[in-house]
Structure formats: structure tokens, C-alpha cells
């Protein structure tokens, strides 16, 4: 058994895709004396049950950069670290029901072009050429992203972990962190197996980030602005027509996003994966009667398909093939949300030599880029890209728990909402006011 490390340059708390990516990128930057702590097995939080979609599209410059980098990293990661990877680059089609949505797509295409990506606008008659099972009579067009796809979240995390270990970094599984303290300019990270003295500490604890954040309050920290949503997706039985089409064409269907109806539909082997972002959504662990469990590793919420009924019916009308298959499995798991739906990655406000890489709503898509950004913050003191929209310091003390819950539910229900200039979303109003 390996000796327990008592010192390190960096300790990362949390072993999901983001935490593993942070460790990998630090090690690649030459900082191999780093330790990742995971209370259970790697991926035990939100990573293991994630759908694994990997888009590049975003209307945020920071997020688009992270997601673009992730797709580039993932293409070569398996070979780079000698680990098997199921990464399918299928392309994706985002549907537009209005001219306003097409204008948003044109803007995203321009952003992508400036980052070296070749997003394409599709006319209505071009959509069926790429997705023959779709109804298009009420559409205005679509945005096609050739680099979109999906990846196995567990394989991704294990590949990043292997790459980090091969470079000399350490991963301690089944080693819960229990607190932190200061010793001069260093941090002492306490675990059930002993203490680790380090220069820097990273909160990458996913939906436990708020609980971990409490440990830093004596040293200038604040309550991490976040809440937790229930997100469901359903997997169908195999569909013979889909199997035949894939065999004939030699690849999977593009991932379909009906953003005005608020769901994604993806080919999963020879069936389909439907994941809505419903308006009548549900938050968890937001009040004393529904507390955050001490350990929710590898657990799910009970199925709750009734609140998805409208979205399932809408998807069946859009892709009638969906209605021919039975439901094989339902996944209903916790996903963390910040009040604006953006992750927290950067310096921990008010706390020296402490960083956050947490509250990733799309941690699989953004995980690769997040590791790069976090490693740059620690090793260089700055990032290549403008990351202010994801910086933890963008929030101040107006983000109480009621505000976080209201905004998180609003963001979830409008996951694909169009963000017009000067539009004021109603949830949480009057919480932040001028003097």
C-alpha cells in the first residue's frame, strides 16, 4: 500500500471529471506534487450518471472556449494516456422555431468562427438530409456543429486520472476530506486518514461544494452560491429502423436539440436518449425537511416522469420514431447550479491560495477546459482566456440561499433560453440594489 502523503503543492477536494481534469492539467504543467481526495470512488457524484454530451456551442465566450478545448482534448486523450475511450463525434443539429432563434445561431456561428470552429447554418430542407426521421414543417432552420458528440463520463474521468498518475500526481480514493486549517502561509487539509500540508487547495466537490466551502469561512470565505436540481433523462429500447440506418450509413445520428421546446435527443446505441429541461422543475436539498445527505455516492432520485409528459409528447411529434419504442431506463440525478447557470472556476473570494472548480452544470463538456483554466490560475496567476463570466468573485453577499434556489430553478427551466440584451429575468429581483 502506498504511503500516505503528508505534503503537496496542491490538494484537490473532489474526484469527478472536473477534479480529475484539474489534477491532469497541473501535472502536465509540471506540478506533479499534487493530491486529489475523493470520499468514495472517482465519479461518485454527478459524473457517473451524466448523459455525457460534449457540445462546443455556447453564447458565452468563456464557456465556448472551455467546451471547444474539451472537444480537442478528448479526441486525442485515449491515445495520449493509453486508456480506452468511447467518444463519438456525431455532430449536432439545433432547431430554430423562429427568426429570433436563427439570429442567435448566426451570432454563435460568428463566435465560433473567431475561435476556429466551423459551425454551419442549415436551411429547413437541409435538416432532413442529416436527420431523416425528423418533422420539419414548423421550423425556420438549424445550426449544425460538426464537433458535437458524446463521451462516456466514467471513461473520461479514469483516463484523466491515469494521465495524472502517470505524470506523478496522486489520487486518494475512499479518503474523505473533513476540514481545513491554516499553518502560516500553508493549508492543512484534514482527512480521515491524516493531514496533508499544501500551498494551494481546490474545492472541486460538485454538489457538495457548499459544504466544503463552509470550512473556509474562518479564513475569509463565504457561502458558495449554488443549489441542486433534479435532472432526468430516459433511455429507450432498441429501435430496428435506427439500427438499420446506422448500419447503412456507418455512424450514429447527429445529436438533436430542440431548444425552443427545451430538450435534447441523442442516439444511444440503437435506441434514443431524451433529456428535457422542464419548466416545472424540481430542486433538492434546499430546506431543513430535505437536507443534503452525508453521502449520496452513486445514488439517484426516484423516477418522476409525470413532469416530463409534455416534453416527451413534443419529442414524439418531432421525431415520431421515438414513439415506437418503450422506456428502458430513467436516470434522475443531482446537478449543481449557480444562480446564472455558469460554473465557479477561479480564486476563492477572500481566501488566499484557495480556488474553486465547482458547480459545473455541464461538467463533462466543460471539464477539459476547466482543468486547463484552473491549472493556469494556480501555476501562472492568470488565464489565457477571459474567464470573468465564470469567476467565483462575480458574486457578492446578495446571493443568499433563497436567491440561489429561485435563480437556479429559473435557469434550469430556461436552459436553452435566448438571452436578449437588457432582458431582465424575473426571479430574485430586488435582491441586488443600487445604494
Q: PLM features: what roles do these ranges have?
A:
Residues 52-130, 260-265, 269-273, 420-422:
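Dinucleotide-binding Rossmann-like beta1-alpha1 core, especially the glycine-rich loop
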Residues 18, 42, 208:
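Conserved Rossmann-like nucleotide-cofactor binding loop
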Residues 4-18, 35:
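Beta1/beta-strand and adjacent pyrophosphate-binding region of the FAD-binding site
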Residues 27-47:
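Glycine-rich FAD pyrophosphate-binding loop
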Residues 195-252:
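Central helical "cap/lid" subdomain
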Residues 144-200, 211:
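Helical element adjacent to the flavin cofactor pocket in flavoenzyme catalytic cores
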Residues 65-68, 95-103, 144-162, 172, ...:
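Short beta-strand to alpha-helix junction loop
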Residues 260, 269, 283-286, 291-411, ...:
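C-terminal catalytic lobe of FAD-dependent flavoproteins
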